[in-house]
């Protein structure tokens, strides 16, 4: 089922796949400014539960908002509105990169409405991320494209990545983050939820690639802060293990959802 959520700020496109009886999996893409495309493989989990994907406002198939509107609150309001619109009372929440930041903010506000939290290639402290990205960039001779090929996605011949790059909104990235991963000039400058991580008492899974922008130091911050978090590392992946090691990624997510629901 595809649909559109109409709001004053603009239309939000969404897709719900599957009608199984298990708790829905709600997925938050990264960026800021990217699209749902590289998350589409998660719909293979829809044989047992609804899988919900959407393009955040300003991105992909959703309506472009005005540049002055960009803020964390804007995207949190959109997420709340979408859950209300789709009657998603209790969900597993999965966020990658920026989507993981959004997932953390949402979980800190609405923990009781979540069954579990999956944090994929993400962070709790923007300054730490920028510092680690700068370190990684300094280790890569060559261009920024060479850096991205090593730490974002290691196989350029991928339809989902091509579509995402064609439909993403770089203005959102610039306004929310900045010109690159190691320079924060946007609304997320100073973003830091480390002190609040112990508030999260729900089951949590931290996922990352061995060559990820989400480095061991960044992951350690999440694992030490969230009481019931555990980690899985994908040895052949960088920042997009859902594409780089799809079968293992999906099996890992499925097994985690099972384990939570069996409690």
Where are the model-predicted features located?
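Hydrolases whose catalytic domains are alpha/beta-hydrolase-1, hotdog thioesterase
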Residues: 102-106
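Flexible "cap/lid" loop of the alpha/beta hydrolase fold
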Residues: 108, 115-143
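Alpha/beta-hydrolase
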Residues: 143-205, 221
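Conserved loop-alpha-helix segment in the C-terminal half of the alpha/beta-hydrolase fold
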Residues: 194, 199-237
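N-terminal cap/lid segment of alpha/beta-hydrolase-fold proteins
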Residues: 1-11
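Active-site loop/oxyanion-hole signature of alpha/beta-hydrolase fold enzymes
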Residues: 52-98, 251
